[in-house]
UniProtKB/Swiss-Prot annotation:
Role: Methylates ribosomal protein L11.
E.C. designation(s): 2.1.1.-
Lineage: Bacteria, Bacillati, Bacillota, Bacilli, Bacillales
Species annotation: Listeria innocua serovar 6a (strain ATCC BAA-680 / CLIP 11262)
Molecular-function annotations in GO: protein-lysine N-methyltransferase activity
Annotated disulfide bonds: none
Family indicated by similarity: Belongs to the methyltransferase superfamily. PrmA family.
Leading EC class: transferase
Gene Ontology CC, one term: cytoplasm
Protein name: Ribosomal protein L11 methyltransferase
Length: 314
């Protein structure tokens, strides 16, 4: 088989939207080369598995590489893929010095290239995300989430995902019922299940994402707790007693359904919203307040924000 590599040079803020677009066009795997991963100070908890080399990373920004079977259909789609990525600026997503390059690669190169940049990542004192092909020995009481990022939508390493997982660690109680809106890879649902949630509904509008989530959920043996549904946000989800709703999606999308979140939550229920770039945080905060939600806490990592709000006790 012949493969093509699509290489996109962009900003850290654009990583997840760009990766999602590439996956929606049929990418079989996505790798992310972010210089911030190298420059960020980390305690080397993972030995050689976690070793990073400066030469593996760009001078600035982020390089995203996606791998496609080189078919006639893909070749014809190349201009559309590039234009769709450029159109992300209409959502106020900064692309930086955007560069879009397509190269041919052989089978062996494709099979290993994207795995080079994905390593175990400790999200909290208790939770570590581990690529499915790595051997990793957890410490006592450590929660391991196995992911195969070749399938779709997020590896758990992006700041917005980390913000959500930390908030779940703080607010989720054993036995809680939860809805994960825009589940992507399923990582937040899996984390919630392993933190003790009793029942989880994971929704995503994209069929590729729901299939990826189902596979990752099976990989983590949490399918008895998590139900995956292809669905548009909370549309036609007739629930009014949910303990937590979590959504790691763009601010513009969060603005579409705060009233539905309010209706889905039981009194005292928590809404964890992330995927919010810093300059959109105030707009989202006001929309949540206007829907009747009470702001509990605002957390920030880099340019990204998570807003935790709750429905008042009536």
């Amino acid at each position: 088989m012949e493969w093509s590599e699509v290489e996109v040079h962009t900003t850290n803020e654009a990583v997840e939207p760009v990766a999602n677009v590439l996956t929606e066009f049929g990418a079989a795997g996505v790798s992310i080369e972010d210089v911030a991963d190298f420059l960020r100070e980390r305690e080397d908890k993972f030995g050689e598995i976690y070793a990073l080399k400066r030469e593996d990373y760009p001078e600035d920004g982020v390089i995203i590489k996606a791998y496609f079977l080189k078919t006639t259909e893909f070749v014809e789609q190349i201009p559309e893929i590039e234009q769709t990525l450029k159109n992300l600026t209409t959502f106020d997503i900064p692309l930086g010095k955007f560069q879009f390059v397509v190269n041919d690669v052989d089978d062996e190169e494709w099979a290993t290239a994207w795995k080079k940049y994905y390593h175990p990542v400790q999200i909290t004192d208790r939770i570590t995300i581990v690529p499915s092909w790595e051997s990793y020995t957890p410490s006592a009481n450590e929660i391991i989430i196995e992911l195969d990022p070749g399938m779709a939508f997020g590896t758990g390493t992006h700041p917005t995902t980390q913000l959500c997982i930390r908030a779940l660690s703080d607010y989720l109680q054993p036995g809680d019922e939860l809805i994960d809106v825009g589940t992507g890879s399923g990582v937040l649902s899996i984390a919630s299940a392993k933190l003790g949630a009793k029942s989880i509904l994971a929704t995503d509008l994209d069929e590729i994402a729901t299939r990826a989530a189902e596979e990752n959920i099976r990989l983590n043996k949490t399918e008895n707790i998590i139900t995956v549904k292809q669905n548009n946000l909370l549309q036609d989800i007739n629930k009014s007693d949910v303990d937590i709703v979590v959504a790691n999606i763009l601010a513009e999308v969060i603005l579409l359904f705060p009233e539905d979140v309010y209706k889905a939550l039981k009194p005292g229920g928590i809404f964890i919203a992330s995927g919010i770039i810093e300059d959109k945080a105030k707009v989202v905060e006001e929309a949540l307040k206007n829907a009747g939600l009470i702001i509990e806490k605002i957390e920030q990592q880099g340019d990204w924000v998570a807003i935790i709000s709750k429905r008042g006790v009536e």
